Amino acid sequence: NKENGGVSTARNTGLALAKGEFIALLDSDDEWLKDKIEKQLSVFNQDSKIGFVGGLINKLLQHEEKLLEIPLSNLIFKNYFQPSTVIFVREIVDKIGFFDETQKYAEEGNYFMRIANLYKCVLLNSQVVLYGQGKGGFGVSGLSANLKEMEKGELRNLSFAYKQDFISVYTYIVAVVYSVLKYFRRILIVKLR
């Protein structure tokens, strides 16, 4: 009944209502593959320390490792997780809370960093969703089409991580420079399409 408050508000409503042991997210323009949940739940059974499992949106992104651990130190430089690919233990919501409803862009990066600061996060080397009804990623449509605002959101996430003592000042500076370079690269790619 709440007026459209954006993706974080919608996700938080779902998180607040969730009762199960695991929580999975699904964006409106994505579709889970039929074996997504089964594949990801089996990962939790392999290692009780795992609290968060992501998957791939594209078979072309597959790598040699079946499972790749993604520590916070990696997540600072690249968001490996697309929201519709993730599943995590319910306990995470109790411990870290909800998505930041004041952040409209790159809000999942903030949430995933907060998770990775406390939990073991892994990436399953398997496509688990049909992403965005075929859209081509950043700069194409939806919120991610606004590259400038997405970059501001990413820089906000890095500032948050530094202020929370998740990362050192050195890591913060390197991550900001790297993020800005990625931003200019994205602009170039979009202009050349």
Regions found by a protein language model. Name each.
Residues 1-19, 31:
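Conserved donor nucleotide-binding strand/loop of the catalytic core
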Residues 5, 30-31, 57, 103:
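Acidic metal-phosphate-binding loop of nucleotide-sugar-dependent transferases
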Residues 11, 32-37, 49, 115:
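Acidic donor-diphosphate engagement hotspot in glycosyltransferases and nucleotidyltransferases
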Residues 16, 55, 69-149:
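Conserved nucleotide-sugar donor-binding catalytic segment
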Residues 23:
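Short aromatic/hydrophobic "clamp" motif used to bind/position activated sugar donors
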Residues 26-28, 54:
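Active-site acidic Asp-centered loop
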Residues 35-65:
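Conserved donor NDP-sugar-binding/catalytic core segment of glycosyltransferases
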Residues 131, 142-168:
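Catalytic core of nucleotide-sugar-dependent glycosyltransferases
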